[in-house]
Structures are given as C-alpha cells and as structure tokens.
Amino acid sequence: MKIVRVQYTTKPEFASVNQENIRQIVNELKSINHPGIRYSAYLLPDGKTFMHLDHLQNEEAHQVLQSLESFKKFDDELWASELEVEPKLEVLTLVAST
C-alpha cells in the first residue's frame, strides 16, 4: 500500500476550476471502479489550499491514476495556473485505521 499526501495553494481565482477538475477525476475513477485506488481531496479553510490523499494498492494503481485523461487535464491546468504554493508531496506510513 502506498499512501501519498499532496498539498498546494492555488490563486483564489483558480480554486473553483481546480475543484471542478478534481470532481472530474473522481467521476472517472468511479467509472473505472479500480479496487486498488482510493482518492480523496480536501479544501482547507482558506478556500484555496488543497490536500489530496491517495491510497494506492501498488505502483500499477498509481500508474492508472496518473494515466486518466481527467488527471492529465487537472495536472496540466494546475501547473499552468501560477500556484501560490507549489505542491508538497509526502509518502505516508499507515499506523492505524478503522
């Protein structure tokens, strides 16, 4: 299991576009129903900082996520948007869960 946490801050005017791009990723993931991918995204109280939490069964699942058309669109538009704070990626170790 690979757990990845990514956090970044968009410009305020891009936040709603980013939310829609994230919704498109979720919709595509629901349509393929891959058992090895659990994807969540959160908007922090400032309204422009996003945190993504990806639970990936293996590297193949990670590649599936990154190959989605919706993910590619999200990634391209995010980098083109002139972020306030660039993404910080951390690989987490699960200690406990319910």
Walk through the language-model features, giving the residues of each.
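Phenylalanine-focused residue identity feature
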Residues: 14, 50, 71-74
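Short, well-ordered beta-strand segments in beta-rich or mixed alpha/beta enzyme
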Residues: 2-9, 37-68
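Short, surface-exposed ligand-recognition loops at beta-strand->loop->(often short) alpha-helix junctions
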Residues: 9-20
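Residue-level signal for secondary-structure boundary sites
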Residues: 14-16, 60-62, 97
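Intrinsically disordered, low-complexity segments enriched in polar/charged residues with Gly/Pro
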Residues: 15-16, 26-30, 41-43
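Glycine-rich beta-strand-turn "strand-cap" elements at beta-sheet edges
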Residues: 8, 37-48, 75-98
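An amphipathic, aromatic/His-enriched active-site/gating alpha helix that lines ligand/cofactor pockets
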Residues: 24, 28-37, 55-89
